[in-house]
């Protein structure tokens, strides 16, 4: 973590939420001992490797994750407390973004061990349960295991707004869905 932070400082780049969420997720996992097996050290390394890659790209002015296809982790700054909050996107390779596209918002089920770092790694490595054609799938993190109430609800709404600012979303075709706790959201 120190090496990534030092790299950021040496490059004199302003961290976007897209990078800050990655670094902070590992810092939180270390601070609160959120490593539940030996294999999760590799999870932290993968998240930090992506953070370092993004720092290098940002420093060179070549951010690619904004136009990436496939599984993409992004972030935004919360109006609640100013914290960087993560979300995942699934962007089909054949997406026609010249036309307004639907947005499917998938609310995850409860996961007592799904911390920021674990959520980010899942969104970097595993597609979700739905794969609509010519549409984006949004996976908000949504703080707290409370059925997307309170801060979690605001997080979902802010994720949607952030995605609408960066992608050509058809505001008449935004679908909210989920399973278990996500279905209650």
Briefly describe each language-model feature range.
Residues 178-185:
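Glycine-rich nucleophile elbow surrounding the catalytic serine of serine-hydrolase chemistry
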Residues 173-175:
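Residue in the alpha/beta-hydrolase core beta-strand immediately N-terminal to the catalytic nucleophile
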Residues 32-101:
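A domain-start/cap signature at the N-terminus of enzymes
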Residues 1-23:
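Amphipathic, heptad-repeat alpha-helical segments
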Residues 12-19, 37, 41, 145-153, ...:
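Solvent-exposed, acidic/flexible segments
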Residues 17, 24, 28, 42, ...:
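Solvent-exposed, polar/charged alpha-helical surfaces in well-ordered, non-transmembrane soluble domains
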Residues 98-167:
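Active-site machinery of serine-nucleophile hydrolases
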Residues 2-9, 27-31, 35, 53-60, ...:
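Sec-exported extracytoplasmic/periplasmic mature domains
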